[in-house]
Amino acid sequence: MIRSIRHSLSMLLSLAALALVPASPAVTQAAEAATRMELPAPNKTGGMPLMQALNARRSTKTNYSGAALSAQQLSDLLWATWGANREDGRRTAPTAMNRQDVRVYVALENGVWQYDAGHALIKVLDGDWRGQMGGGSLTLLYAIPQANEWGGAHVGSLYQNAGLYSASAGLGNFVHVSGLHALDGKLPLPEGWKVYIIQTVGLLK
């Protein structure tokens, strides 16, 4: 009887010890890779001259191929939209008093990701939600505090940046509210925040 109890205690202690063993670096890195996507450095030179991009900018609601953007195109699009363009962390789009109180989420085939100022994507939701939000290669979701009276103006600066990049890169884009509430309650938004508007971007047929 005593021997059986000792054996059981020994097994429990062994299991507890295994539970305390930290995951190997390879396992930890694999888990981080599944939830964080480092983007290639954005290409900040070249492209279409500004006046030509303004002339080419338009809304394209149909004729998307559904193919994914390249990693470089995705990087350039997000940097143009809301990337840091100065060492002090200021962005490509202005906000009143530099509050930077806008979040950009990207709905891709492999989930919904939040754009991080360090030029990376952080996964916040699994699944392909693009079909509920206009299709295309991806959909950008712009979230702001509901109490911010300037939030709409801030978002407008961002989606204009995205639209001009799309024109320069030969991509289609359109700003809309179709499927605006598809992810209500699913995104890790701070209290009092909401998705204000969305923008579909994609390769054309």
Regions found by a protein language model. Name each.
Residues 2-13:
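Bacterial N-terminal signal peptides that target proteins for export
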Residues 14-15, 158:
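Acidic, serine/threonine-rich, low-complexity C-terminal transcriptional regulatory domains
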Residues 18-27:
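C-terminal segment of classical bacterial N-terminal signal peptides
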Residues 27-136:
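N-terminal amphipathic, basic helical "cap/leader" segment at the start of enzyme domains
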Residues 57, 77, 104, 138-186, ...:
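Small-aliphatic-rich amphipathic alpha-helix that forms the alpha element of a beta-alpha
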Residues 69, 83-85, 111, 146-148, ...:
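Solvent-exposed loop/turn segments at secondary-structure junctions
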Residues 109, 117, 143-146, 201:
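Fold-independent oxyanion-binding glycine-rich loops
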Residues 188-205:
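A glycine-rich helix N-cap at a beta->alpha junction
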